[in-house]
Amino acid sequence: MKLSMKLKLITTDYQNQVLLDTMQRFNSACDYISDIAYNNKVFGQVNLHHLTYYDIRDKFGLGAQMTVRAIGKVVESYKIEKKYKHTFKPFGAIVYDSRILKFKFPDKISISMLEGRQVIPFIFKNYRDIDIRRASGQADLVYHDGIFYLVVCVDLPEPPQDDTKEFLGVDMGIVN
Protein backbone atom coordinates (compact mmCIF):
# COMPACT_ATOMS: atom_id res chain seq x y z
CA MET A 1 0.00 0.00 0.00
CA LYS A 2 1.35 3.45 -0.88
CA LEU A 3 0.73 6.59 1.14
CA SER A 4 1.80 10.19 0.59
CA MET A 5 3.57 11.97 3.41
CA LYS A 6 4.20 15.68 3.69
CA LEU A 7 7.56 16.58 5.23
CA LYS A 8 8.13 20.15 6.39
CA LEU A 9 11.63 21.37 5.51
CA ILE A 10 13.39 23.48 8.14
CA THR A 11 15.43 25.80 5.91
CA THR A 12 17.82 28.60 6.75
CA ASP A 13 17.25 31.99 5.08
CA TYR A 14 20.00 31.18 2.59
CA GLN A 15 18.56 27.73 1.75
CA ASN A 16 15.09 29.24 1.46
CA GLN A 17 16.31 31.80 -1.09
CA VAL A 18 18.29 29.26 -3.11
CA LEU A 19 15.28 26.89 -3.20
CA LEU A 20 13.06 29.76 -4.40
CA ASP A 21 15.60 30.63 -7.10
CA THR A 22 15.82 26.96 -8.08
CA MET A 23 12.02 26.72 -8.37
CA GLN A 24 11.80 29.85 -10.50
CA ARG A 25 14.63 28.76 -12.79
CA PHE A 26 13.23 25.21 -13.07
CA ASN A 27 9.74 26.45 -14.01
CA SER A 28 11.17 29.05 -16.43
CA ALA A 29 12.98 26.16 -18.10
CA CYS A 30 9.67 24.25 -18.23
CA ASP A 31 8.04 27.25 -19.97
CA TYR A 32 10.89 27.35 -22.48
CA ILE A 33 10.65 23.60 -23.14
CA SER A 34 6.86 23.88 -23.44
CA ASP A 35 7.24 26.63 -26.03
CA ILE A 36 9.57 24.47 -28.13
CA ALA A 37 7.35 21.39 -27.71
CA TYR A 38 4.21 23.25 -28.75
CA ASN A 39 5.77 25.11 -31.70
CA ASN A 40 7.43 21.96 -33.07
CA LYS A 41 4.56 19.62 -32.10
CA VAL A 42 7.06 17.35 -30.36
CA PHE A 43 5.62 15.86 -27.18
CA GLY A 44 7.61 12.66 -26.62
CA GLN A 45 10.32 12.41 -23.96
CA VAL A 46 13.16 11.26 -26.23
CA ASN A 47 12.55 13.69 -29.10
CA LEU A 48 11.99 16.63 -26.78
CA HIS A 49 15.13 15.69 -24.88
CA HIS A 50 17.17 15.79 -28.11
CA LEU A 51 15.67 19.17 -29.05
CA THR A 52 16.15 20.94 -25.72
CA TYR A 53 18.63 19.29 -23.35
CA TYR A 54 21.86 21.21 -24.10
CA ASP A 55 19.96 24.45 -24.64
CA ILE A 56 18.38 24.18 -21.18
CA ARG A 57 21.70 23.35 -19.53
CA ASP A 58 23.31 26.43 -21.11
CA LYS A 59 20.46 28.94 -20.73
CA PHE A 60 19.17 28.06 -17.28
CA GLY A 61 22.19 26.54 -15.56
CA LEU A 62 20.29 23.50 -14.34
CA GLY A 63 22.13 20.30 -13.53
CA ALA A 64 21.82 17.28 -15.79
CA GLN A 65 19.14 15.46 -13.80
CA MET A 66 17.19 18.66 -13.05
CA THR A 67 17.10 19.29 -16.81
CA VAL A 68 15.79 15.77 -17.41
CA ARG A 69 13.12 16.30 -14.71
CA ALA A 70 12.05 19.61 -16.34
CA ILE A 71 11.65 17.89 -19.71
CA GLY A 72 9.70 15.11 -17.98
CA LYS A 73 7.37 17.61 -16.30
CA VAL A 74 6.54 19.18 -19.67
CA VAL A 75 6.03 15.79 -21.33
CA GLU A 76 3.64 14.74 -18.54
CA SER A 77 1.61 17.95 -18.89
CA TYR A 78 1.21 17.47 -22.65
CA LYS A 79 -0.03 13.90 -22.20
CA ILE A 80 -3.30 15.40 -20.99
CA GLU A 81 -3.84 18.17 -23.56
CA LYS A 82 -1.88 19.01 -26.71
CA LYS A 83 -4.12 21.67 -28.26
CA TYR A 84 -2.84 24.57 -26.14
CA LYS A 85 0.59 25.75 -25.08
CA HIS A 86 1.20 24.99 -21.40
CA THR A 87 2.69 27.45 -18.94
CA PHE A 88 4.08 26.77 -15.49
CA LYS A 89 3.75 28.82 -12.31
CA PRO A 90 7.03 30.37 -11.08
CA PHE A 91 6.75 28.49 -7.79
CA GLY A 92 5.24 25.29 -9.18
CA ALA A 93 6.37 21.97 -7.75
CA ILE A 94 9.67 20.38 -8.70
CA VAL A 95 9.73 16.62 -9.09
CA TYR A 96 12.83 15.13 -7.46
CA ASP A 97 14.06 11.59 -7.94
CA SER A 98 16.65 9.47 -6.16
CA ARG A 99 19.53 11.01 -8.13
CA ILE A 100 18.92 14.55 -6.87
CA LEU A 101 17.36 13.82 -3.48
CA LYS A 102 18.78 11.54 -0.79
CA PHE A 103 17.43 10.85 2.67
CA LYS A 104 19.89 11.17 5.55
CA PHE A 105 17.97 9.36 8.25
CA PRO A 106 16.47 9.96 10.67
CA ASP A 107 15.62 13.61 9.99
CA LYS A 108 17.56 15.19 7.11
CA ILE A 109 17.60 15.23 3.32
CA SER A 110 20.35 16.07 0.85
CA ILE A 111 18.74 18.00 -1.98
CA SER A 112 20.17 19.34 -5.24
CA MET A 113 19.75 23.07 -5.87
CA LEU A 114 21.30 25.68 -8.17
CA GLU A 115 24.17 26.21 -5.73
CA GLY A 116 24.88 22.48 -5.37
CA ARG A 117 23.64 20.07 -2.72
CA GLN A 118 22.42 21.18 0.69
CA VAL A 119 21.51 19.09 3.72
CA ILE A 120 18.19 20.27 5.15
CA PRO A 121 16.43 18.96 8.28
CA PHE A 122 12.75 18.00 8.09
CA ILE A 123 9.89 17.22 10.45
CA PHE A 124 6.64 15.38 9.91
CA LYS A 125 3.51 14.50 11.82
CA ASN A 126 3.39 10.78 12.41
CA TYR A 127 -0.35 10.12 12.38
CA ARG A 128 0.26 6.44 11.85
CA ASP A 129 3.14 4.22 12.70
CA ILE A 130 5.00 4.93 9.46
CA ASP A 131 8.68 4.29 8.92
CA ILE A 132 9.96 7.19 6.81
CA ARG A 133 12.82 4.95 5.64
CA ARG A 134 10.23 3.28 3.41
CA ALA A 135 10.04 6.43 1.25
CA SER A 136 10.60 5.46 -2.36
CA GLY A 137 10.60 6.82 -5.87
CA GLN A 138 9.92 10.44 -6.62
CA ALA A 139 9.15 13.34 -4.31
CA ASP A 140 7.59 16.73 -5.04
CA LEU A 141 9.10 19.90 -3.61
CA VAL A 142 6.18 22.23 -2.89
CA TYR A 143 6.20 25.86 -1.70
CA HIS A 144 3.10 26.91 0.24
CA ASP A 145 2.57 29.97 2.47
CA GLY A 146 6.30 30.66 2.72
CA ILE A 147 7.19 27.10 3.75
CA PHE A 148 8.80 24.33 1.73
CA TYR A 149 7.34 20.84 1.92
CA LEU A 150 8.48 17.60 0.39
CA VAL A 151 5.65 15.23 -0.56
CA VAL A 152 7.01 11.69 -0.62
CA CYS A 153 5.47 8.34 -1.40
CA VAL A 154 5.87 5.75 1.36
CA ASP A 155 5.51 2.07 0.52
CA LEU A 156 3.81 0.26 3.40
CA PRO A 157 3.39 -3.49 3.72
CA GLU A 158 -0.09 -4.78 3.07
CA PRO A 159 -2.04 -5.50 6.26
CA PRO A 160 -2.54 -9.22 6.88
CA GLN A 161 -5.78 -10.68 5.55
CA ASP A 162 -8.07 -12.41 8.02
CA ASP A 163 -8.89 -16.01 7.15
CA THR A 164 -12.62 -16.38 7.74
CA LYS A 165 -13.62 -19.94 8.52
CA GLU A 166 -17.26 -19.31 9.36
CA PHE A 167 -19.80 -16.99 7.88
CA LEU A 168 -23.46 -16.13 8.27
CA GLY A 169 -25.81 -15.83 5.30
CA VAL A 170 -28.75 -13.42 5.48
CA ASP A 171 -31.82 -13.87 3.28
CA MET A 172 -32.86 -10.40 2.08
CA GLY A 173 -36.00 -11.66 0.40
CA ILE A 174 -36.95 -11.81 -3.27
CA VAL A 175 -36.64 -8.64 -5.31
CA ASN A 176 -38.86 -8.50 -8.42
Give the predicted meaning of each segment.
Residues 1-176:
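Nucleic-acid substrate recognition interfaces
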